[in-house]
Amino acid sequence: MSATLTEMVQPPNRTAPTAEPRWRNSALYFTAAWSGFFVMGVELLGGRLMAPYFGSSIFDWGALIAVFMTALALGYLIGGQLSLRSPSLRGLGLLLIAEALLALPVILFADPVFDALSFSIEDPRYGSLLAALLMFSAPTVFSGMVSPYAVRLLIDNIEKSGQSAGRLYFASTLGSAGGTIFTTF
């Protein structure tokens, strides 16, 4: 990777970024924050929804957290793979729509599903694990897909890829903190 003499002497091109990338980048950071907010909100509300049926012991919270962590990990993996195929804002929007639509069954069917599982599975540890898996894994996988996909959309300069990823995960984690506070206070 040797630079030519002209490249070494010539100052770097310092043109001002256009308005479109600034707007686009802000939208991507907001999207990451929203996704983090969404995950923590659903996770904490999930614990509250499950408590009347399975309790709120360490086993129940452990099952819920394990399902969310596993679903996020799977989403990160799939989102990274998807980002290799023609990434676009439209594609990111479709991930967000899928995330929201897959959360609808939680609102519509959580009580009957939790009720049925609490009666059919004797050990509440396994009932809560299965309940969390059935109700929360699908929307959480799609939530996990958002960040790696958004990172790919942010990166237009490989030298700043770490900075872009760091800022995106900063926004996502702040969103998670906001979702936690909003849901619990």
PLM features: residue spans?
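Alpha-helical transmembrane segments of multi-pass membrane proteins
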Residues: 1-185
